[in-house]
Design a protein with these regions (language model features):
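Long, highly hydrophobic alpha-helical transmembrane signal-anchor segments
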Residues: 1-21
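Cytosolic, membrane-interface loops and tails of multi-pass inner-membrane proteins
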Residues: 22-53
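Transmembrane helix-loop junctions in multipass membrane proteins, especially transporters and channels
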Residues: 24-31, 79, 106, 130
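Alpha-helical transmembrane segments of multipass membrane proteins
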Residues: 71-75, 98-99, 125-126
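Structural signature of hydrophobic alpha-helical transmembrane segments
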Residues: 80-91
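Interfacial loop-to-transmembrane junctions
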Residues: 96-120
Length: 132
């Protein structure tokens, strides 16, 4: 279970580093005033930066429930092939969501990836509630 969790951590750091790089580049080039980043007010960042910021924020919402599930599975030694398949499926769908969000950003496609990932997360929690 640690490997799917680690993969999601890597995705989160990847998006976070891209966001930091975009903010630095936008401030350095003058596209966004550096003072904007103090309170996130007073300027309008480019759409590409907004997408990165929203995606980074998304990675601290529902995935928190995934990390809790993973920690319980590890602590109780409950990992099974089915649980690992659900976990990897969840991580894969979060990756798909990120690729769509930061790429062509079609809302319906992004929502379907979000919905499917949350269905797997709910399945993990239902299984966990059943076995505990």
């Amino acid at each position: 279970m640690i490997y799917p969790m680690f993969a999601l951590v890597l995705l989160t750091f990847f998006v976070g580093i891209r966001l930091g790089s975009a903010r630095f580049a936008n401030a350095r080039s003058g596209r966004v005033k550096g003072s904007y980043y103090r309170l996130m007010q007073g300027d309008v960042p480019p759409d590409s930066e907004v997408k990165l910021a929203r995606n980074f924020s998304n990675l601290f919402e529902a995935p928190v429930l995934f990390y809790v599930t993973g920690a319980i599975v590890i602590a109780k030694n409950l990992a099974t092939p089915a649980v690992l398949a659900l976990a990897w499926g969840y991580v894969a769908l979060r990756l798909v969501h990120t690729v769509i969000h930061l790429g062509y950003n079609h809302p319906i496609h992004r929502f379907l990836a979000f919905l499917a990932s949350n269905a797997l997360l709910l399945a993990l929690w239902c299984w966990l509630a059943y076995v505990l």
